[in-house]
């Protein structure tokens, strides 16, 4: 069985779906490398938004795009998205029942024994 990291699988699916769906927009918080989103950013620069180190804005902008009919996917390292943007997740996404997807990625060191 071949195992691939979840973040690569997510990027592969987004790449495939973006071929036919121009409403897909991927946003990230200065983490295109660690989120494995560089292939998507290269293939679809008009559907990729680099938000910089601004997790609150990442969530708010993705919620706004979703309200306008876009399919927004916001990616950020787990430690930042879960803490820095809690209020935006609660108010901009949850309270308004917004169809925006936020996902995190976590990179763990591997050790050999």
Predicted regions and their residues:
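Conserved acidic/glycine
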Residues: 1-39
């Amino acid at each position: 069985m071949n195992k691939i990291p979840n973040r690569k699988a997510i990027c592969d699916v987004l790449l495939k779906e973006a071929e036919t769906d121009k409403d897909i927009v991927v946003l990230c918080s200065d983490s295109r490398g660690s989120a494995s989103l560089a292939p998507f950013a290269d293939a679809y620069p008009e559907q990729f938004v680099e938000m910089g180190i601004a997790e609150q804005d990442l969530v708010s902008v993705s919620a706004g795009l979703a309200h306008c009919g876009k399919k927004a996917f916001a990616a950020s390292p787990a430690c930042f998205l879960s803490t820095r943007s809690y209020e935006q997740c609660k108010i901009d996404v949850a309270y308004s029942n917004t169809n925006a997807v936020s996902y995190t990625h976590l990179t763990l060191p591997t050790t050999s024994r």
